[in-house]
From Swiss-Prot:
Residue positions binding NAD(+): Y100, C101, D120, N121, L122, V123, R124, D163, I164, R189, N207, Y270, K274, V300
Protein family according to the UniProt entry: Belongs to the NAD(P)-dependent epimerase/dehydratase family.
The protein's Enzyme Commission number: 3.13.1.1
Protein name: UDP-sulfoquinovose synthase, chloroplastic
Organism: Spinacia oleracea
GO BP term, example: glycolipid biosynthetic process
Classification via Pfam families: Epimerase
UniProt site (Important for catalytic activity): K274
């Protein structure tokens, strides 16, 4: 039975003299390249190419239907189908479910017999369009992804297309779906993107912080028992010269002892937005009794999970560019096309890493073992620590097994960060819940490098070198080189 998937996402679409040649496609709906997101009560009007012209208001709608049917969204008003929780299964809302971590998680939870709802404004696809980037792996539209999943498994995933910064949209979505758990991936997740220029720095903070506050209010107003599973980042901690604990540290000062939130030393406007999120969530747990798990995730690599490997239309995105690509993914693509691995600076930057298959496993464990009402708990979500030099050496060794001649070069570091430092982060809580990690030494070839070789003809080598400088960020909007 077809599901009508609601949106009250409104967009102000900029007029264009050559509209037909400058369109962005989501499913069957076309959007001009240049537009401004509009939220109902937001003081911010962000993204790129804002204009003073009178702009047309368009209501965006989305549908999912079985593969052998076609459904046309009615014009005029939004509507929801509330199936009710008659199955007794837990209902999980995945905000940002069209993204890298969100899509893999949504499929994994659906397979595990959760009732899943994806909420997404699809803006991540727009970022690629604006910056001239593309996923290494071809990715289908979210509508086709969901239809294919239903065709293969018989399982339905609800879809609500809209902006969680628009509280009216979010409220209607909450009232419609009635989630037991909210998994919140729905944030601008790139540090380099947040450092391109002022407008993108502002967008990152506005989108991430206001969106999370809206989620907290929605839980308070419509679903007080709901468990928030929020994706944070290990980057909140920075690189202190002491061990990194899981969220909290017990200290003795002037003869008195207390357990306090671990100090935060964020290194970009993106990482700072995550710090603000953590503070806001901790406050509302204390003040309102919300239950929340903050997953401070390390750097994720890989593309394949058991579910995304079922069909090409379920394939996840694989970012390799200098804006959205993570270090290991970038190195594997560079090796595949014969480009030297680009190590930033001295290469001693050490971080926690995990396979995308472990991301979905961690989220499932957090859902199955929820926080108590009023509890704010923090899990450090990674499985192994590596320096950038270590990663380059691993990729070089793996490349040799495939007959690749892999070289490494040092390039000026575009970031402001320590290039040699102490790093020892604790990560025991998820292991205690039953996490069984996929280690990089066992999975580098099958999870990353083979995909890079398979799709190497899709690589745009102009996107390999760093293009965003932490020190050169300014007020003037920047267009990355094509």
């Amino acid at each position: 039975m077809a599901h009508l998937l609601s949106t009250s996402c409104s967009m102000k679409v900029s007029p264009s003299e050559k509209l037909s040649s400058k369109c962005w496609n989501i499913g069957s709906t076309k959007y001009p390249m240049s537009f401004t997101q509009q939220t109902s009560k937001s003081a911010f009007k962000s993204l790129v190419h804002q204009r003073n012209n009178t702009q047309k208001l368009t209501v965006v709608r989305a549908t999912t239907v079985p593969l052998n049917q076609e459904t046309k969204a009615e014009s005029g008003t939004s509507s929801f189908e509330n199936n009710g929780n008659t199955s007794g299964r837990k209902r999980v809302m995945v905000i940002g479910g069209d993204g890298y971590c969100g899509w893999a998680t949504a499929l994994h939870l659906s397979k595990k017999n959760y009732d899943v709802c994806i909420v997404d404004n699809l803006v991540r696809r727009l970022f690629d369009h604006q910056l001239g980037l593309d996923s290494l792996t071809p990715i289908a539209s979210i509508q086709n992804r969901i239809r294919r999943w239903q065709g293969l498994t018989g399982k339905t995933i609800d879809l609500h297309v809209g902006d969680i910064c628009d509280f009216e949209f979010l409220a209607e979505t909450f009232k419609s779906f009635e989630p037991d758990t909210v998994v919140h991936f729905g944030e601008q997740r790139s540090a380099p993107y947040s450092m391109i220029d002022r407008s993108r720095a502002v967008y990152t903070q506005q989108n991430n912080v206001i969106g999370t506050i809206n989620v907290l209010f929605a839980i308070k107003e419509f679903s007080e028992e709901c468990h928030l599973v929020k994706l944070g980042t290990m980057g909140e901690y920075g690189t202190p010269n002491i061990d990194i604990e899981e969220g909290f540290i017990t200290i003795t000062h002037n003869g008195r002892t207390d357990t306090l939130p671990y100090p935060k030393q964020a290194s970009s406007f993106y990482h700072l937005s995550k710090v603000h999120d953590s503070h806001n969530i901790a406050f509302t747990c204390k003040a309102w009794g919300i239950r929340a798990t903050d997953l401070n995730q390390g750097v994720v690599y890989g593309v394949m999970t058991e579910e995304t490997a079922m069909h090409e239309e379920l394939c996840n995105r694989f970012d390799y560019d200098a804006v959205f690509g993570t270090a290991l993914n970038r190195f594997c693509v560079q090796a595949a096309v014969g480009h030297p691995l680009t190590v930033y600076g001295k290469g001693g930057q050490t971080r926690g890493y995990l396979d995308i298959r472990d991301t979905v496993q961690c989220v499932e464990l957090a859902i199955a073992n929820p926080a108590k009402l009023g509890e704010f708990r923090v899990f450090n979500q990674f499985t192994e620590q590596y320096s950038v030099r270590d990663l380059a050496a691993l990729v070089t060794k793996a490349g040799e097994k495939l007959g690749l001649n892999v070289e490494t070069i040092s390039v000026p570091n575009p970031r402001v960060e320590a290039e040699e430092h102490y790093y020892n982060a604790k990560h025991t809580k998820l292991a205690e819940l039953g996490l069984k990690p996929h280690l990089l030494s066992d999975s580098l070839l099958d999870s990353v490098l083979n995909f890079a070789v398979q799709y190497k003809d899709r690589v745009d080598t102009k996107q390999i070198m760093p293009s965003v400088s932490w020190k050169k960020i300014g007020v003037k909007p920047q267009t990355l080189r094509a």
